[in-house]
Swiss-Prot record:
Residues 100-274 form the Tyr recombinase domain. GO terms for biological process: DNA transposition. The gene is xerA. This is Tyrosine recombinase XerA. It comes from Pyrococcus horikoshii (strain ATCC 700860 / DSM 12428 / JCM 9974 / NBRC 100139 / OT-3). The keyword Cytoplasm applies. Site-specific tyrosine recombinase, which acts by catalyzing the cutting and rejoining of the recombining DNA molecules.
Length: 285
Protein backbone atom coordinates (compact mmCIF):
# COMPACT_ATOMS: atom_id res chain seq x y z
CA UNK A 1 0.00 0.00 0.00
CA UNK A 2 2.81 2.38 0.98
CA UNK A 3 4.67 1.56 -2.24
CA UNK A 4 1.56 2.37 -4.27
CA UNK A 5 1.19 5.72 -2.47
CA UNK A 6 4.82 6.56 -3.26
CA UNK A 7 4.24 5.86 -6.97
CA UNK A 8 1.09 8.02 -6.97
CA UNK A 9 2.87 10.84 -5.14
CA UNK A 10 5.80 10.62 -7.57
CA UNK A 11 3.38 11.02 -10.49
CA UNK A 12 1.71 13.99 -8.78
CA UNK A 13 5.07 15.67 -8.18
CA UNK A 14 6.01 15.23 -11.83
CA UNK A 15 2.68 16.67 -13.02
CA UNK A 16 2.95 19.53 -10.51
CA UNK A 17 6.46 20.35 -11.76
CA UNK A 18 5.14 20.52 -15.33
CA UNK A 19 2.30 22.79 -14.16
CA UNK A 20 4.79 25.14 -12.47
CA UNK A 21 6.95 25.20 -15.59
CA UNK A 22 3.94 26.20 -17.68
CA UNK A 23 3.20 28.89 -15.09
CA UNK A 24 6.63 30.36 -15.87
CA UNK A 25 8.29 29.48 -12.56
CA UNK A 26 12.08 29.30 -12.49
CA UNK A 27 13.90 25.97 -12.16
CA UNK A 28 14.96 26.91 -8.65
CA UNK A 29 11.37 27.67 -7.61
CA UNK A 30 10.13 24.40 -9.12
CA UNK A 31 12.84 22.50 -7.27
CA UNK A 32 11.94 24.10 -3.93
CA UNK A 33 8.15 23.75 -4.36
CA UNK A 34 8.35 20.07 -5.29
CA UNK A 35 10.76 19.45 -2.41
CA UNK A 36 8.35 20.91 0.15
CA UNK A 37 5.40 19.10 -1.41
CA UNK A 38 7.27 15.79 -1.22
CA UNK A 39 7.87 16.40 2.51
CA UNK A 40 4.15 17.18 2.89
CA UNK A 41 3.31 13.83 1.28
CA UNK A 42 5.91 11.94 3.33
CA UNK A 43 4.24 13.12 6.52
CA UNK A 44 0.94 11.66 5.30
CA UNK A 45 -0.97 14.94 5.13
CA UNK A 46 -4.03 15.57 2.93
CA UNK A 47 -4.46 18.62 0.63
CA UNK A 48 -6.47 20.71 3.10
CA UNK A 49 -5.72 24.00 4.81
CA UNK A 50 -6.09 22.30 8.21
CA UNK A 51 -3.42 19.70 7.38
CA UNK A 52 -1.23 22.40 5.86
CA UNK A 53 -1.33 24.34 9.15
CA UNK A 54 -0.34 21.19 11.07
CA UNK A 55 2.58 20.71 8.66
CA UNK A 56 3.66 24.34 9.04
CA UNK A 57 3.44 24.13 12.84
CA UNK A 58 5.70 21.08 12.79
CA UNK A 59 8.24 22.84 10.54
CA UNK A 60 8.19 25.93 12.76
CA UNK A 61 8.83 23.79 15.82
CA UNK A 62 11.77 22.15 14.04
CA UNK A 63 13.42 25.55 13.54
CA UNK A 64 12.10 26.90 10.21
CA UNK A 65 12.21 30.70 10.00
CA UNK A 66 9.15 32.79 9.09
CA UNK A 67 10.78 33.50 5.73
CA UNK A 68 11.22 29.78 5.03
CA UNK A 69 7.63 29.06 6.10
CA UNK A 70 6.43 31.68 3.63
CA UNK A 71 8.10 29.71 0.85
CA UNK A 72 6.43 26.49 2.06
CA UNK A 73 3.05 28.26 2.10
CA UNK A 74 3.57 29.48 -1.48
CA UNK A 75 4.41 25.92 -2.52
CA UNK A 76 1.31 24.46 -0.87
CA UNK A 77 -0.97 27.20 -2.22
CA UNK A 78 0.33 26.53 -5.74
CA UNK A 79 -0.29 22.81 -5.28
CA UNK A 80 -3.83 23.35 -3.97
CA UNK A 81 -4.61 25.55 -6.99
CA UNK A 82 -3.09 22.90 -9.26
CA UNK A 83 -5.59 20.43 -7.76
CA UNK A 84 -8.46 22.91 -8.19
CA UNK A 85 -8.71 23.52 -4.45
CA UNK A 86 -8.70 27.32 -4.64
CA UNK A 87 -10.86 27.67 -1.52
CA UNK A 88 -8.28 25.74 0.52
CA UNK A 89 -5.46 27.83 -0.95
CA UNK A 90 -7.26 31.04 0.07
CA UNK A 91 -7.34 29.90 3.69
CA UNK A 92 -3.53 29.88 3.86
CA UNK A 93 -2.18 33.30 4.80
CA UNK A 94 1.46 34.32 4.67
CA UNK A 95 2.88 35.58 7.98
CA UNK A 96 4.27 39.08 7.71
CA UNK A 97 8.04 39.37 7.46
CA UNK A 98 9.70 42.52 8.78
CA UNK A 99 11.11 44.37 5.79
CA UNK A 100 14.86 44.46 6.20
CA UNK A 101 17.79 44.61 3.82
CA UNK A 102 21.13 42.95 4.49
CA UNK A 103 23.82 45.29 5.73
CA UNK A 104 25.73 46.75 2.83
CA UNK A 105 29.50 46.34 2.74
CA UNK A 106 31.73 49.35 2.26
CA UNK A 107 33.83 49.58 -0.90
CA UNK A 108 36.91 49.03 1.23
CA UNK A 109 35.42 45.83 2.68
CA UNK A 110 34.60 44.52 -0.81
CA UNK A 111 38.14 45.33 -1.91
CA UNK A 112 39.57 43.37 1.04
CA UNK A 113 37.40 40.32 0.29
CA UNK A 114 38.37 40.27 -3.40
CA UNK A 115 42.06 40.74 -2.55
CA UNK A 116 42.25 37.50 -0.54
CA UNK A 117 40.73 35.24 -3.23
CA UNK A 118 42.97 32.19 -3.74
CA UNK A 119 42.56 31.89 -7.50
CA UNK A 120 41.15 33.53 -10.63
CA UNK A 121 37.90 31.56 -10.54
CA UNK A 122 37.02 32.59 -7.00
CA UNK A 123 38.08 36.17 -7.64
CA UNK A 124 35.81 36.36 -10.69
CA UNK A 125 32.89 34.87 -8.75
CA UNK A 126 33.23 37.63 -6.16
CA UNK A 127 33.57 40.30 -8.85
CA UNK A 128 30.43 39.15 -10.69
CA UNK A 129 28.32 38.93 -7.55
CA UNK A 130 29.35 42.48 -6.72
CA UNK A 131 30.09 44.11 -10.08
CA UNK A 132 27.05 42.71 -11.93
CA UNK A 133 24.69 42.29 -8.99
CA UNK A 134 23.99 38.63 -9.81
CA UNK A 135 21.91 36.24 -7.75
CA UNK A 136 23.71 33.01 -6.79
CA UNK A 137 21.48 30.88 -9.05
CA UNK A 138 22.12 33.25 -11.98
CA UNK A 139 25.88 33.05 -11.44
CA UNK A 140 25.83 29.23 -11.36
CA UNK A 141 23.72 29.03 -14.52
CA UNK A 142 25.92 31.36 -16.58
CA UNK A 143 27.36 29.73 -19.68
CA UNK A 144 30.40 30.88 -21.62
CA UNK A 145 28.13 31.60 -24.59
CA UNK A 146 26.20 34.06 -22.39
CA UNK A 147 29.24 36.37 -22.38
CA UNK A 148 29.32 38.69 -25.39
CA UNK A 149 33.03 39.47 -25.68
CA UNK A 150 32.59 41.78 -28.66
CA UNK A 151 29.96 44.08 -27.13
CA UNK A 152 30.88 43.49 -23.49
CA UNK A 153 27.69 42.29 -21.84
CA UNK A 154 26.21 39.25 -20.10
CA UNK A 155 22.93 37.56 -20.89
CA UNK A 156 21.44 36.35 -17.63
CA UNK A 157 18.91 33.65 -18.50
CA UNK A 158 16.06 32.42 -16.34
CA UNK A 159 16.43 34.81 -13.44
CA UNK A 160 13.79 35.17 -10.75
CA UNK A 161 10.41 34.34 -12.24
CA UNK A 162 12.08 32.89 -15.33
CA UNK A 163 13.06 36.37 -16.52
CA UNK A 164 16.04 37.04 -18.79
CA UNK A 165 18.05 40.25 -18.87
CA UNK A 166 21.14 41.87 -20.40
CA UNK A 167 23.81 43.30 -18.10
CA UNK A 168 26.52 45.48 -19.65
CA UNK A 169 29.90 44.86 -18.01
CA UNK A 170 32.99 47.03 -17.89
CA UNK A 171 36.08 46.28 -19.98
CA UNK A 172 37.92 45.60 -16.73
CA UNK A 173 35.46 42.89 -15.72
CA UNK A 174 35.50 41.44 -19.24
CA UNK A 175 39.29 41.22 -19.02
CA UNK A 176 38.98 39.27 -15.75
CA UNK A 177 36.60 36.81 -17.46
CA UNK A 178 39.01 36.33 -20.38
CA UNK A 179 41.94 35.87 -18.00
CA UNK A 180 40.08 33.21 -16.05
CA UNK A 181 38.91 31.31 -19.15
CA UNK A 182 42.52 30.94 -20.31
CA UNK A 183 43.12 28.75 -17.24
CA UNK A 184 40.26 26.37 -18.03
CA UNK A 185 41.24 22.90 -19.28
CA UNK A 186 37.76 21.37 -19.64
CA UNK A 187 34.97 21.44 -22.22
CA UNK A 188 32.11 22.40 -19.91
CA UNK A 189 29.73 24.99 -21.42
CA UNK A 190 29.35 26.65 -18.02
CA UNK A 191 31.35 29.72 -17.04
CA UNK A 192 32.06 28.25 -13.60
CA UNK A 193 32.63 24.59 -12.75
CA UNK A 194 33.31 22.62 -9.59
CA UNK A 195 37.01 21.96 -8.95
CA UNK A 196 37.13 18.85 -6.80
CA UNK A 197 34.91 16.55 -8.84
CA UNK A 198 36.13 14.29 -11.61
CA UNK A 199 33.33 15.49 -13.86
CA UNK A 200 33.39 19.22 -14.36
CA UNK A 201 29.82 19.93 -13.29
CA UNK A 202 28.54 23.46 -13.11
CA UNK A 203 29.17 25.33 -9.89
CA UNK A 204 26.69 24.64 -7.08
CA UNK A 205 25.06 27.39 -4.97
CA UNK A 206 26.48 25.69 -1.88
CA UNK A 207 30.03 26.14 -3.20
CA UNK A 208 29.38 29.84 -3.84
CA UNK A 209 28.08 30.33 -0.31
CA UNK A 210 31.05 28.49 1.17
CA UNK A 211 33.70 30.44 -0.72
CA UNK A 212 32.07 33.82 0.03
CA UNK A 213 31.92 32.87 3.70
CA UNK A 214 35.55 31.69 3.57
CA UNK A 215 36.94 34.90 2.10
CA UNK A 216 34.78 37.05 4.35
CA UNK A 217 36.13 35.20 7.38
CA UNK A 218 39.70 35.78 6.17
CA UNK A 219 39.21 39.52 6.55
CA UNK A 220 37.07 39.31 9.69
CA UNK A 221 33.67 39.76 8.06
CA UNK A 222 30.50 37.66 8.09
CA UNK A 223 29.46 37.94 4.45
CA UNK A 224 26.79 36.33 2.26
CA UNK A 225 26.54 36.31 -1.55
CA UNK A 226 23.38 38.41 -1.35
CA UNK A 227 25.28 41.05 0.60
CA UNK A 228 27.59 41.50 -2.38
CA UNK A 229 24.54 41.91 -4.66
CA UNK A 230 22.99 44.35 -2.19
CA UNK A 231 26.28 46.27 -1.99
CA UNK A 232 26.25 46.57 -5.80
CA UNK A 233 22.86 48.29 -5.62
CA UNK A 234 23.82 50.48 -2.66
CA UNK A 235 27.11 51.68 -4.16
CA UNK A 236 25.48 52.38 -7.53
CA UNK A 237 22.82 54.46 -5.78
CA UNK A 238 25.45 56.31 -3.74
CA UNK A 239 27.23 57.21 -6.98
CA UNK A 240 24.13 58.86 -8.37
CA UNK A 241 22.73 56.07 -10.58
CA UNK A 242 18.95 56.29 -10.97
CA UNK A 243 17.07 53.80 -8.78
CA UNK A 244 14.99 52.65 -11.78
CA UNK A 245 18.14 51.71 -13.69
CA UNK A 246 19.42 49.80 -10.67
CA UNK A 247 16.14 47.90 -10.45
CA UNK A 248 16.50 46.79 -14.06
CA UNK A 249 20.13 45.78 -13.59
CA UNK A 250 19.08 43.68 -10.60
CA UNK A 251 16.51 41.85 -12.71
CA UNK A 252 13.31 43.35 -11.40
CA UNK A 253 12.06 43.84 -15.00
CA UNK A 254 11.67 41.27 -17.79
CA UNK A 255 14.10 41.52 -20.71
CA UNK A 256 11.16 42.01 -23.11
CA UNK A 257 9.56 44.66 -20.91
CA UNK A 258 10.84 48.17 -21.60
CA UNK A 259 8.44 50.33 -19.62
CA UNK A 260 7.86 48.82 -16.19
CA UNK A 261 9.47 51.64 -14.27
CA UNK A 262 10.55 53.95 -17.10
CA UNK A 263 12.12 53.70 -20.54
CA UNK A 264 15.62 52.35 -19.98
CA UNK A 265 17.85 51.37 -22.88
CA UNK A 266 20.95 49.20 -22.92
CA UNK A 267 22.93 52.34 -23.70
CA UNK A 268 21.78 53.94 -20.46
CA UNK A 269 22.56 50.75 -18.54
CA UNK A 270 26.09 50.75 -19.98
CA UNK A 271 26.56 54.41 -19.08
CA UNK A 272 25.46 53.59 -15.54
CA UNK A 273 27.99 50.73 -15.23
CA UNK A 274 30.81 52.85 -16.67
CA UNK A 275 29.90 55.82 -14.50
CA UNK A 276 29.98 53.77 -11.30
CA UNK A 277 33.40 52.13 -12.05
CA UNK A 278 32.83 49.61 -9.25
CA UNK A 279 35.27 46.96 -10.52
CA UNK A 280 37.94 49.53 -11.42
CA UNK A 281 37.80 50.87 -7.86
CA UNK A 282 38.04 47.41 -6.28
CA UNK A 283 40.95 46.32 -8.50
CA UNK A 284 42.70 49.66 -8.17
CA UNK A 285 42.55 50.34 -11.91
Amino acid sequence: MKEREEIVNSDILEEFATYLELEGKSKNTIRMYTYYLSKFFEEGYSPTARDALKFLAKLRKSGYSIRSLNLVIQALKSYFKFEGLDSEAEKLKNPKIPKSLPKSLTEDEVKKIVSVADNLRDKLILLLLYGAGLRVSELCNLKIEDVNFEKSFLIVRGGKGGKDRVIPISKTLLFEIERYLKTRKDNSPYLFVEKRRNRKDKLSPKTVWMLVKKYGKKVGLNVTPHQLRHSFATHMLERGVDIRIIQELLGHANLSTTQIYTKVTTKHLREAIEKAKLIETILGG
